[in-house]
A protein has these predicted regions:
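Sec-dependent bacterial lipoprotein signal peptides
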Residues: 1-5
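Bacterial lipoprotein signal-peptidase II cleavage site
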Residues: 6-19
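Short, glycine-/small- and polar/acidic-enriched structural segments
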Residues: 18-167, 184, 190, 202-208
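Short, solvent-exposed loop/beta-turn-alpha elements that line the ligand-binding surface or hinge
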Residues: 51-60, 211-224, 290-299
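Well-formed, non-transmembrane alpha-helical positions, independent of function
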Residues: 76-77, 95, 129, 176-177, ...
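Pocket-lining segment of extracytoplasmic ligand-binding domains
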Residues: 90-92, 100, 173-269
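Secondary-structure end/capping motifs
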Residues: 238-312
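Conserved C-terminal helix/tail region of periplasmic/extracytoplasmic solute-binding proteins
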Residues: 303-330
Length: 330
């Protein structure tokens, strides 16, 4: 489902102001900034920004948002220049950069590790305990696949032979499969873990993939945080409207700080935008690892993560690591 929300109002012109040349006048006109967010933690971090724009409280630019169910829906919108900013899986940002010959830049890391391995029972306590099991997950070709495969390999398990990974199109399918299969486990991101537990309180979080990733990196002598999501901007838009990009980042930072610091109020907004129900959001938000990292810190964290993915499978990042121009403001 797609929800369209948010539209800032343009400031009026003062009739007493002397006539100015066209270029000067153009700088006073709000820029239309079209943003696509994925249903989940990335959209949850934006809800304060969205609600303020929706209420007409942000008149600096003309803000509009749409919430999409799948990353597959975002790619064509970016390619066709139908959106200017998008929240996408971290590796997809690099894939888009390569597919568009540098047509996108990453402006912020917005979500760290949110993946959890869940089971019905109490048999999985280490990654090694996954040997011989069927793992249900959504997100083939994105962070879930590459993070899981890396963690399995570092624990001495072959993802192709020591476990069976069944890729589903939606997280709800994974939950259903978990309930049906004896000994099965499901890898789910927040807030979907909380959604599943609300429906079945026997579902237990067995492994925090964020912690397992960090342990695997440490054992391999590598240093990279598990990064789930980032925000990207079309390069053409960033070049034409750098002030609008900076305004976007300012509002986004404030939104993330509000969401992390005001969980009950943020949960109401999340429910209002039909991302997940308010009750689920209230429980899930503290575990969603919503963050805001820009500039050199963003580059340091994201480049390390992409290098690990590239070492596993070059196609995970679109065939090659992105160039310096990929990192906005770094």
């Amino acid at each position: 489902a797609i929800g369209l929300v948010g539209c800032g109002s343009a400031a009026g012109n003062d009739a007493a102001t002397p006539a100015r040349d066209a270029d000067a006048a153009a700088t006073t006109e709000p820029v239309a900034v079209r943003t696509a967010a994925l249903k989940g933690p990335t959209a949850m971090g934006l809800v304060r920004f969205m609600s303020e724009a929706d209420a007409g409280n942000l008149a600096d630019e003309d803000w509009s948002f749409q919430i999409l169910a799948s990353a597959d829906e975002v790619t064509p919108l970016i390619a066709k220049s139908e959106v200017d900013v998008a929240t996408v899986p971290a590796n997809l940002a690099s894939v888009l950069y390569n597919k568009t010959d540098g047509g996108v830049r990453v402006v912020a890391v917005n979500t760290l590790g949110v993946l959890y391995v869940c089971e019905l029972g109490d048999e999985v306590n280490t990654v090694s305990d996954l040997r011989g099991r069927t793992i249900y997950s959504a997100g083939k070709g994105a962070t879930p696949q590459y993070a899981l495969e890396y963690v399995l390999r570092q624990a001495g398990l072959d993802p192709d032979s020591d476990v069976t990974i069944e890729w589903k199109s939606e997280h709800a399918e994974c939950v259903a499969a978990l309930a049906e299969g004896a000994g099965a486990v499901a890898m789910l991101p927040q807030p979907f873990v909380t959604t599943a537990q609300a429906k079945n309180d026997q579902i237990r979080v067995a492994l925090d993939l964020n912690r397992e990733w960090e342990s695997a990196c440490e054992a391999a002598g590598q240093k990279a945080r598990l990064i789930t999501g980032v925000a990207v901007v079309r390069s053409e838009f960033a070049d034409a409207h750098p002030e609008a990009v900076d305004a976007f980042l300012d509002h986004y930072r404030e939104s993330v700080e509000y969401v992390n610091g005001n969980v009950p109020e943020a949960a109401k907004l999340v429910g209002g935008y039909d991302i997940v129900p308010e009750t689920v959001a209230a429980k899930a938000l503290p575990a969603c690892n919503i963050t805001f990292v820009v500039g050199q810190d963003m580059r340091d964290q994201l480049s390390g993560y992409l290098e690990i993915l590239f070492g596993q499978n070059a196609q995970a990042v679109g065939g090659s690591l992105p160039g310096d121009d990929f990192y906005y403001g770094a």
